[in-house]
Regions:
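Active-site gating/metal-coordination segments in enzymes
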Residues: 47-48, 58-156
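Active-site neighborhood of phospho(di)ester-bond hydrolases with catalytic His/Asp-centered motifs
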Residues: 7-10, 51-53, 81-82, 110, ...
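Active-site environment of divalent metal-dependent phosphoester hydrolases
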Residues: 15-17, 56-59, 87-89, 116, ...
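Alpha-helical scaffolding within the catalytic cores
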Residues: 30-37, 61-69, 92-96, 158-161, ...
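Short, electropositive alpha-helical surface patch
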Residues: 61-77, 165-166, 191-202, 253-257
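Mid-to-C-terminal alpha-helical segments outside catalytic/metal-binding sites
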Residues: 1-13, 19-48, 225-237, 245-279
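Conserved, mostly hydrophobic/aromatic
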Residues: 11, 41, 67, 109, ...
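Catalytic pocket-lining loop regions of alpha/beta-barrel enzymes
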Residues: 104-108, 121-237
Length: 279
């Protein structure tokens, strides 16, 4: 692909460990392969995407190896974000950092509080934030609701990110899912901290959902209010959470926002290009 990058999906997943996604009822029509993803990206006009290593592999080493292979086969269209679980202990965190040292294509780190029992400001994560600072890469943090009922949302409030954003002011931090349902709380954390961003991933359901139109209208309203609270669109990122969300649906949320065209363009790609160093 040549030419300027206009659309970047900052949040999607592809893994054989997520094969059961078809059985969840989220996307029964999906071609859950790399070719299927690239085809859906083309149809939605998405130039690049950020592939987030899933949290479901037998080991983080397995998940990283799989994600690296997918990225290497994507003809430069995917960027790699890896993950780590601090509850596995200091040695496991050190081992993962050592793996990242041998991963030159690493573009970011994703944390899954709620799915794993820790807060974003857990001191066991300090080496991870310090590593992100050294590599000059962002840390993406799950915030808001969890996909499964066993997740613990006490760990996922956006306000829990404020402390670490202050302690690691030079580390860019992304509040995934805009903290939904605590979108106003996420907006405050973004407004207060110049190193904090929020993405729009996972905010909508499949169009077949009976209340989809009303949900989409409410979501647009809440995201618009959040952007107004922040006072700028420059730290808001488009993301889908594919395969859970159809890419065209996720793009449509952004294009429907009552914003100047330059702000919609920034959310769809310009901000991500700056954050992830895409050219």
């Amino acid at each position: 692909m040549t030419g300027a990058i206009s659309r970047v999906d900052t949040h999607l997943h592809l893994s054989r460990y997520w094969r059961e996604i078809k059985a969840t009822g989220y996307r029964n029509d999906i071609d859950y392969t790399l070719n299927g993803l690239l085809h859906e990206m083309d149809a939605a006009g998405i130039d690049r995407a950020v592939l987030i290593q899933v949290n479901d592999a037998p080991t983080v080493r397995d998940g990283l190896a799989e994600a690296r292979g997918i990225v290497s086969e994507s003809a430069g269209r995917l960027r790699l974000v890896s993950t780590v679980d601090p509850t596995k202990g200091a040695e496991a965190v050190s081992d993962q950092i050592a793996l990242w040292d041998r991963t030159p294509e690493l573009a970011g780190i994703k944390l899954f509080p709620g799915y794993n029992p820790f807060y974003p400001h857990d001191r066991r994560l300090d080496p991870v934030y310090e590593y992100a600072h050294r590599r000059r890469i962002p840390v993406l943090i799950h915030t808001g609701d969890t996909m499964d009922a066993w997740g613990l949302v006490k760990y996922t409030r956006p306000i829990e990110v404020d402390e670490v954003a202050v302690r690691f002011r030079d580390v860019p931090i992304v509040l995934c899912h805009f903290g939904n349902p605590w979108i106003d709380e996420a907006a405050e954390v973004v407004y207060k901290n110049p190193n904090v961003y929020a993405d729009t991933s996972g905010l909508l359901a499949h169009p077949s959902y009976p209340l989809f139109d009303r949900m989409a209208e409410l979501c647009r309203k809440r995201v618009m209010e959040a952007i107004l609270m922040v006072g700028s669109a420059e730290r808001v990122l488009y993301g889908s959470d594919w395969p859970l969300i159809d890419l065209k649906v996720a793009v449509g949320l952004v294009t429907s926002l009552d914003l100047p065209e330059r702000d919609r363009a920034a959310i769809l790609g310009g901000n991500a290009c700056r954050l992830f160093g895409l050219t």
